A protein has these predicted regions:
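Phosphate- and other anionic-substrate recognition elements at nucleic-acid/protein interfaces
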Residues: 1-181
């Protein structure tokens, strides 16, 4: 009989470089996280702005070009994207956000990068323990998790980092409830 084989303990997996995106037609927040042990490191965070006076097609182009620059510089392995959230009160907002999401999905596909969608409540619950956390609570949770000296501003950037963190932690779980887009 052969002696028992001892297998090494399973190593936690990490999702590689994650690009978190908070889509918007006026401002699209983004955050790039890279693995570093159990806690990721923030490599870059910012806002891609479109010019409100331009035609819709030009604004979408501006978002796409800005996002392509981020892809070229950081080569993310996954995009974590906030799902569309809309109440019946503001259908126009959801429609405008859909244009930004469309170009985000296009740029990700062009760069052969999978996109995973997360509902806002899912992100809030994972980071703060409450699906009803406010913007300030999200900013503080992101600051703490990434060990930043200051909170990330504006909210679009903090939200993008929160979405990336949600993916970073969810991707390590056996049953990730996220939706591949």
């Amino acid at each position: 009989m052969n002696p028992p084989v001892t297998l090494p303990p399973p190593q936690p997996t990490h999702p590689g470089v994650v690009l978190g995106i908070d889509p918007g037609l006026n401002r699209t927040g983004y955050a790039v996280l890279a693995p570093r042990g159990r806690t990721p490191i923030l490599r870059e965070a910012g806002v891609i702005r479109s010019t409100p006076k331009l035609a819709l097609s030009e604004r979408v182009r501006e978002i796409g070009e800005g996002l392509q620059e981020v892809f070229e510089q950081y080569r993310p392995e996954t995009v974590a994207l906030e799902q569309v959230f809309s109440t019946g009160q503001f259908p126009q907002s959801a429609l405008l956000m859909a244009h930004a999401r469309g170009v985000i999905l296009f740029i990700a596909a062009r760069n052969l990068c999978p996109v995973i969608g997360y509902a806002p409540r899912q992100v809030k619950r994972l980071l703060t323990g409450s699906g009803k956390a406010d913007k300030r609570q999200i900013q503080l949770a992101v600051q703490s998790e990434l060990r930043l000296a200051q909170i990330l501003e504006p909210n679009d950037v903090a939200d993008a980092a929160a979405i990336a963190l949600c993916h970073y932690h969810s991707a390590r779980l056996p049953a990730n409830p996220a939706e591949r887009l």
